[in-house]
UniProtKB/Swiss-Prot annotation:
Pfam families, per the entry: CTP_transf_like
UniProt-recorded name of the protein: Probable nicotinate-nucleotide adenylyltransferase
Assigned EC number: 2.7.7.18
Matches recorded under PANTHER family: NICOTINATE-NUCLEOTIDE ADENYLYLTRANSFERASE-RELATED, PHOSPHOPANTETHEINE ADENYLYLTRANSFERASE
SUPFAM superfamilies: Nucleotidylyl transferase
Protein origin, superkingdom: Bacteria
Keyword NAD applies: yes
Name of the gene: nadD
Reactions catalysed: nicotinate beta-D-ribonucleotide + ATP + H(+) = deamido-NAD(+) + diphosphate
């Protein structure tokens, strides 16, 4: 029997409660054994200023999932030299774990960008894409995407960074304390 592993990639700058909720909902609805949080370098489609360091983002992710044994952090994209594409990551993971079905979890707002992903025609044969519905985003693409529903949330890392003084309710406590202690995003 094949293993079922979810992958939630992102900049996680910072990781927040909606990230946890997406991973939990996908794990439950798809009966996944575990979910890997895959922090990435700034992806080709994003340009973020004021970004936390890789080390800070990784530490916040580890704090967020601490004590949840079916969540793990995978650092391969941060360690890869040069550009890091999902295609390369999945090719490596499948080679390392051939007896595993991978479910790549993306926010509903990212589904419409799938046609622009590097080697998407090959990638859709390698993984099952899972679109987590968020408010006001519905996209149709010519690829099979498993859609799962998540309770409505409007949390985004961008909004948290831009309004850090009022963001405590959207962050796991340990992440909030880390942000305060390290004065990230202007938090003194």
């Amino acid at each position: 029997m094949k293993h079922k592993v979810g992958i939630l990639g992102g900049t996680f700058d910072p990781p927040h409660l909606a990230h946890l909720q997406m991973a939990e909902v996908a794990k439950q609805q798809l009966n996944l054994e575990k979910v890997l949080f895959l922090p990435n370098k700034i992806p080709p489609h994003k340009h973020i200023s004021g970004m936390a360091s890789n080390d800070a983002r990784v530490e916040m992710l580890r704090l967020m999932i601490e004590g949840i044994d079916y969540f793990e952090v995978d650092l391969r994209e941060l360690k890869r030299a040069g550009k890091s594409y999902t295609y390369d990551t999945m090719r490596d993971m499948i080679s390392e774990q051939p007896n595993t079905d991978f479910y790549f979890i993306i926010g509903g707002d990212m589904v419409e960008y799938l046609p622009k992903w590097y080697h998407i025609e090959d990638l859709v044969k390698m993984v099952t894409f899972v679109g987590v519905h968020r408010p006001h985003y519905q996209a149709e693409v010519p690829y099979d995407v498993v859609n799962i529903d998540m309770p409505e949330t409007t949390i985004s890392s961008t909004e948290i960074r831009n309004n850090i003084e009022h963001a405590e309710a959207f962050l796991p406590e340990k992440v909030w304390l880390y942000i305060k202690e390290h004065q990230l995003y202007g938090k003194k």
